[in-house]
A protein has these predicted regions:
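Glycine-rich, proline-tolerant flexible connector loops at the mouths of alpha/beta enzymes
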Residues: 7-31, 80-86
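Conserved residues at the C-terminal ends of beta-strands
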Residues: 9, 43, 79, 174
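Short amphipathic alpha-helices and their capping/turn segments at secondary-structure boundaries
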Residues: 19-32, 62-70, 156-169, 201-209
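Acidic/histidine-rich catalytic cores of soluble enzymes
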Residues: 5-6, 40, 100-197, 210
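Catalytic domains of carbohydrate-active enzymes, especially glycoside hydrolases
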Residues: 1-11, 71-72
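Active-site acidic/histidine proton-transfer and metal-coordination neighborhood
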Residues: 29-32, 36, 47-143, 152
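The substrate-binding groove and active-site-proximal loops of carbohydrate-active enzymes
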Residues: 12, 45-54, 84, 148, ...
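Vicinal oxygen chelate
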Residues: 16, 43, 81, 184-188
Length: 211
């Protein structure tokens, strides 16, 4: 009973350092507890159209990934931060930008995972996110699905059957209630697995069969 991995938020790691904490000491505490940093939650705006903003975001992502590496982690979430209100973002351009992010990660040893964000107007659907990963043409490309976000974005869970095991490194398991409806549900309405109506067991069995 229990868990073996954690997924800290980069902003919490930053706050820990600002408060005088040492990443070396934190890594030891994590490892002494028998835990592994499986991934981390970052918000670098790698996908945006503005060249200067995107260049700054890649440097931001580099710093974030270096922190993850120093904690013993090998992955970081790469959501469409900065483009959540943009409806017309070119997915081919997004794929090129994801490739640039992957190149940064490959130099550090941390893999950024293209993340589905159901509430966003960009990469809200599983198919869009998979498209960006495939068209990046990078061997480390992968996606980070989430049961709640797949539902919120309007994709069907059967789409996961098209993905092989290596395409998914981590999988977010968030359940959701029957009310409010999908169109108005928000992140704040998420519930623990088993407390909602999501087909959690069915989805996980299908994912496990792909491993």
């Amino acid at each position: 009973v229990g868990y073996t991995g954690i997924e800290p938020w980069i902003r919490e790691i930053d706050q820990y350092e600002r408060d005088g904490g040492s990443l070396k000491d934190l890594r030891k505490r994590i490892e002494d507890a028998g835990l592994q940093v499986e991934s981390a939650i970052g918000f670098a705006q790698w996908i945006v159209d503005d060249d200067k903003q995107r260049a700054d975001a890649l440097e931001h992502a580099r710093r974030d990934m270096d922190k993850v590496r120093r904690l013993g982690g090998k992955r970081i979430a790469a959501p469409p931060a900065g483009a959540t209100r943009q409806e017309n973002l070119d997915l081919f351009a997004a794929a090129d930008r994801y490739r640039a992010l992957l190149e940064v990660g490959s130099r550090i040893g941390v893999t950024p995972q293209a993340e589905v964000w159901g509430f966003s107007k960009t990469l809200s659907r599983l198919g869009e996110t998979v498209f960006v990963a495939i068209e990046s043409g990078h061997p480390d490309a992968c996606v980070l699905p989430d049961i709640y976000h797949i539902y919120k974005g309007g994709s069907d869970f059967t789409g996961l059957d098209l993905l092989s095991g290596p395409a998914i490194h981590c999988f977010h398991v968030n359940d959701y209630p029957a009310k409010p409806p999908r169109t108005t549900i928000t992140d704040a309405d998420r519930v623990y697995p088993g407390d909602g109506i999501a087909p959690v067991a069915r989805v996980l069995k299908r994912i496990a069969a792909k491993r």
